[in-house]
């Protein structure tokens, strides 16, 4: 399986061919991304174009002899927006062709002449992983090989339908996302298309993998912080909506009599499908630009993943914000799709942080909210609607490890909650999770090696809540004003605390 049916693989999966599409305006194509073959015609060509249905992403692929193998059309708004942002981005300058030269014009003319003959790929279902056990290929000591097949996303060797790597250590031009795809390709726990494994049959056209592999894959793509990775993440998690599965031990027959009766029962891992996890792309926020302007130098540097921005020294002398600025701080905040980028968004684009220094937060507010900053930096947490450590978090707030919530409760007992944010710590709920070693499993049964999480009642938070209710004398706090939050763009607890104090 090429790990990811993305950008190009999505086209094959949906089965949309140029032959069945309205006429394309060939004189209005743009953002051409070509993959040449030395001394031969083009291998692949991707570009944006308009037809009667609107803007779409087109892809064509030729074999080594110049014969057209597949051409496809995809008009998903997320993909076309991502491709356009990638085309205009600084990191891909020189990769895209904006003014076609003679060779590219000939390729477009050839593609136009072959329009009616264009058909989808007549190969195995997208996402099929071919395995060969050791000894089958005559090479001892090799348990699995990834065979060159299909076609891949331009600039990568492992992302797409198949792979084009000469060996397992070779990577493409976009090495970061290519590495993510390669590692996800090697997930040891998966169910191939139309195959039966772990007690379930996969009726999809793509392979489904263990949730831990998908979680690592998503985190790897998000860590790259570039549009190439975002295109792949959006296609895999949002467009194709590929689910994942967790393994649970169940009692089943492990040895049968010849006449069909069960001779011996044992513990066998069974797969349980989990809902898909959405991918939050950095380019989805209009305030985030791939080509930062000189006036915003803070956006031109990669931001640290966990540590918030350092406050400039001159802010320490600023006074408390006025009533006008305090109102502005409670306005909706346009935040990127991840918590680690929300601090940058607040500093650069939020109106409450612009203008004179009198509207900025006093240093006391940051000290009072530092407990929530530690909570955001919790090493083990499960995001909303996310499956991690074989546990699905169905809530709309993150689920934290008990060590992190216990540290928060200890801080609040000693120092009290920040003024104006007395109930913020109750948003994650009164539960947390602990990690346990994987279930005992006989060697060779394909059991997951990652720890598994289980939810428990956070008694330290319950005691804190009871104490607050006793001091308050009422069961609710109607005076608490929550910060506005755009749906799908979560704000970190630290930034919520800053808005409330």
Curated annotation (Swiss-Prot):
Q: What UniProt keywords apply to this chain's record, in alphabetical order?
A: Calcium, Cell membrane, Cilium biogenesis/degradation, Cytoplasm, Cytoskeleton, Disulfide bond, Endosome, Glycoprotein, Hydrolase, Lipid metabolism, Mast cell degranulation, Membrane, Metal-binding, Phospholipid metabolism, Secreted, Signal
Enumerate the PROSITE patterns for this protein. Answer: PA2_HIS
Localisation: Secreted; Cell membrane; Cytoplasm, Cytoskeleton, Microtubule organizing center, Centrosome, Centriole; Recycling endosome
Q: Which SUPFAM superfamilies match?
A: Phospholipase A2, PLA2 (SSF48619)
Which portions of the sequence form the region Disordered?
119-139, 284-339
Return the Polar residues bias intervals: 284-298
Ranges for the region named Phospholipase A2-like are 150-291
- Which ranges of the sequence are coiled-coil? none
Sugar attachment sites are 167, 280, 325, 403
Which reactions is this enzyme annotated as catalysing? Answer: a 1,2-diacyl-sn-glycero-3-phosphocholine + H2O = a 1-acyl-sn-glycero-3-phosphocholine + a fatty acid + H(+); 1-hexadecanoyl-2-(9Z,12Z-octadecadienoyl)-sn-glycero-3-phosphocholine + H2O = (9Z,12Z)-octadecadienoate + 1-hexadecanoyl-sn-glycero-3-phosphocholine + H(+); 1-hexadecanoyl-2-(5Z,8Z,11Z,14Z-eicosatetraenoyl)-sn-glycero-3-phosphocholine + H2O = 1-hexadecanoyl-sn-glycero-3-phosphocholine + (5Z,8Z,11Z,14Z)-eicosatetraenoate + H(+); 1-hexadecanoyl-2-(9Z,12Z-octadecadienoyl)-sn-glycero-3-phosphoethanolamine + H2O = 1-hexadecanoyl-sn-glycero-3-phosphoethanolamine + (9Z,12Z)-octadecadienoate + H(+)
Note on how the cofactor is bound? Binds 1 Ca(2+) ion.
Q: What class of enzyme is it?
A: hydrolase
Tell me which InterPro entries the record gives. PLipase_A2_dom, PLipase_A2_dom_sf, PLipase_A2_His_AS
What EC designation does it have? Answer: 3.1.1.4
Membrane-spanning segments:
none
Entry annotation: catalytic residues: 184, 214
Binding sites annotated in the UniProt record for Ca(2+): 158, 160, 162, 185
Swiss-Prot/TrEMBL cofactor(s): Ca(2+)
| A single GO molecular function term of this UniProt record | metal ion binding
* Function in brief: Secretory calcium-dependent phospholipase A2 that primarily targets extracellular phospholipids. Hydrolyzes the ester bond of the fatty acyl group attached at sn-2 position of phospholipids without apparent head group selectivity. Contributes to phospholipid remodeling of low-density lipoprotein (LDL) and high-density lipoprotein (HDL) particles. Hydrolyzes LDL phospholipids releasing unsaturated fatty acids that regulate macrophage differentiation toward foam cells. May act in an autocrine and paracrine manner.
What domain comment accompanies this record?
A: The phospholipase A2-like domain represents the fully processed form after N- and C-termini are cleaved off. It is the secreted mature form found in biological fluids.
Task: Provide the protein name.
Answer: Group 3 secretory phospholipase A2
């Amino acid at each position: 399986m090429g790990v990811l049916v993305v950008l190009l693989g999505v086209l094959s999966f949906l089965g949309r061919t140029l032959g069945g599409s309205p006429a394309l305006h060939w004189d209005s194509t743009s953002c051409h991304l070509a993959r040449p073959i030395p001394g031969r015609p083009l291998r692949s060509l991707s570009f944006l174009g308009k037809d009667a249905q609107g803007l779409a992403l087109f892809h064509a692929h030729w074999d080594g002899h110049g014969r057209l193998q597949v051409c496809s059309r995809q008009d998903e708004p997320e993909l076309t927006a991502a491709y356009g942002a990638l085309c205009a981005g600084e990191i891909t300058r020189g990769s895209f062709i904006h003014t076609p030269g003679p060779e590219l014009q000939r390729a477009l003319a050839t593609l136009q002449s072959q329009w009616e003959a264009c058909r989808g790929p007549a190969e195995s279902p997208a996402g099929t992983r071919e395995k060969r056990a050791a000894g089958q290929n005559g090479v001892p000591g090799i348990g699995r090989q990834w065979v060159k097949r299909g076609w891949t996303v331009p600039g990568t060797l492992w992302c797409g339908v198949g792979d084009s790597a000469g060996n397992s250590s070779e990577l493409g031009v976009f090495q970061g996302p290519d590495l993510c795809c390669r590692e996800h390709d090697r997930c040891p726990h998966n169910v191939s298309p139309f195959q039966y494994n772990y007690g379930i049959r996969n009726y999809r056209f793509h392979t489904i993998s263990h949730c831990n592999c998908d979680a690592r894959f998503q985190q790897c793509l998000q860590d790259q912080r570039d549009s190439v990775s975002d295109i792949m993440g959006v296609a895999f998690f949002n467009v194709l909506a590929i689910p994942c599965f967790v393994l649970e031990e169940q009692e089943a027959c492990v040895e049968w009599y010849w006449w069909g009766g069960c001779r011996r029962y044992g513990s066998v891992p069974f797969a349980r499908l989990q809902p898909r996890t959405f991918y939050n792309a950095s380019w989805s926020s209009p305030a985030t630009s791939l080509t930062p302007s000189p006036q915003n130098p803070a956006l031109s540097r990669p931001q640290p993943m966990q540590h918030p921005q350092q406050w400039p020294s001159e802010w320490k002398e600023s006074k408390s914000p006025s009533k006008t600025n305090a109102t502005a701080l409670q306005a909706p905040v346009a935040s990127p799709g991840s918590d680690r980028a929300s601090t940058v968004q607040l500093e650069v684009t939020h109106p409450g942080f612009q203008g004179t220094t009198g509207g900025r937060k006093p240093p006391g507010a940051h000290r009072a909210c530092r407990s929530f900053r530690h909570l955001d930096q919790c090493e083990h947490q499960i995001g909303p609607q996310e499956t991690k450590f074989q546990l699905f978090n169905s809530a709309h707030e993150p689920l934290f490890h008990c060590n992190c919530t216990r540290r928060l409760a200890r801080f609040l007992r000693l120092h009290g909650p920040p003024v104006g944010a007395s109930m913020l710590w109750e948003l994650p709920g009164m539960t947390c999770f602990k990690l346990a070693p994987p279930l005992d499993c006989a060697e060779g049964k394909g059991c997951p090696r990652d720890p598994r999480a289980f939810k428990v009642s956070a008694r330290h938070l319950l005691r804190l809540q009871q104490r607050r209710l006793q001091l308050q004398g009422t069961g609710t706090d109607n005076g608490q004003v929550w910060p506005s939050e755009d749906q799908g763009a979560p704000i970190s607890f630290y930034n919520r605390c800053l808005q409330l104090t």
